């Protein structure tokens, strides 16, 4: 049986559960796929060229995580789907010798929400994940605000029709989303007292980090604010990516079931 290689680019990357859940799917669906896929973590030095690394490693597909999603968007031969709007790519697939970029974070995030009755959202951070979430939430009709420590990247969100801030807005929000890397460093993304104010008024505190009770989620729990980590988003975006890796032979709903069973 033919072997194909896949992976996930990131820095840091050792925390990633993507290899676990993707390899479970490659094992489960090898008969349908007619190849055996192997998916592995790839620690990418910050100065690396993603396309060169992809081709050098002989990959058929890859996911992209922090901090490379915007850079991945720039090196693709083609961009498809909502990735065109959000300027960030988390899924790379070699199609007819061309590197094609997709974004499955956007829909993966929305599918992960248990409820869909939110009117507005505050996104903390302005990186690739934040862009994908903002695109999807705007598409779903929510009012979206973005808070970032600097003006870097905020022009994208302004063009999208989001309200942008470098200082915490004095407003209430249904959804408060941590799309920064603060949780990976065991830190809060924002001043504790300011966050408390948002959580007391909010309907859901959502952290894209997963696998542990982050300081962000711990504070929400302390205040009895409903909270959610990024585990379901990870699985949904991975299942949607796997559908791309399988050239649509395996629908994401089937991949999701397998991934959910192992993580």
Curated annotation (Swiss-Prot):
Q: List the protein's name.
A: Shikimate dehydrogenase (NADP(+))
Q: What class of enzyme is it?
A: oxidoreductase
CDD domains for the chain? NAD_bind_Shikimate_DH
Amino acids binding shikimate: 16-18, 65, 90, 105, 210, 237
UniProt KW keywords: Amino-acid biosynthesis, Aromatic amino acid biosynthesis, NADP, Oxidoreductase
Q: Which GO terms describe its biological process?
A: amino acid biosynthetic process; aromatic amino acid family biosynthetic process; chorismate biosynthetic process; shikimate metabolic process
Q: How does it assemble?
A: Homodimer.
From what organism does this protein derive? Answer: Helicobacter pylori (strain ATCC 700392 / 26695)
For this record, an example GO cellular component is: cytosol
List, alphabetically, the Pfam families matched.
Shikimate_dh_N (PF08501)
Q: Taxonomic lineage of this organism?
A: Bacteria, Pseudomonadati, Campylobacterota, Epsilonproteobacteria, Campylobacterales
* NCBIfam families linked to this entry: aroE, PRK00258.2-5
Which InterPro entries does the record cross-reference, listed alphabetically? Aminoacid_DH-like_N_sf, NAD(P)-bd_dom_sf, Shikimate_DH, Shikimate_DH-bd_N, Shikimate_DH_fam
Q: Which family does it belong to?
A: Belongs to the shikimate dehydrogenase family.
Q: Which reaction does this enzyme catalyse, per its entry?
A: shikimate + NADP(+) = 3-dehydroshikimate + NADPH + H(+)
The superkingdom listed in its UniProt entry is Bacteria
| Binding positions (NADP(+)) | 125-129, 181, 208, 230
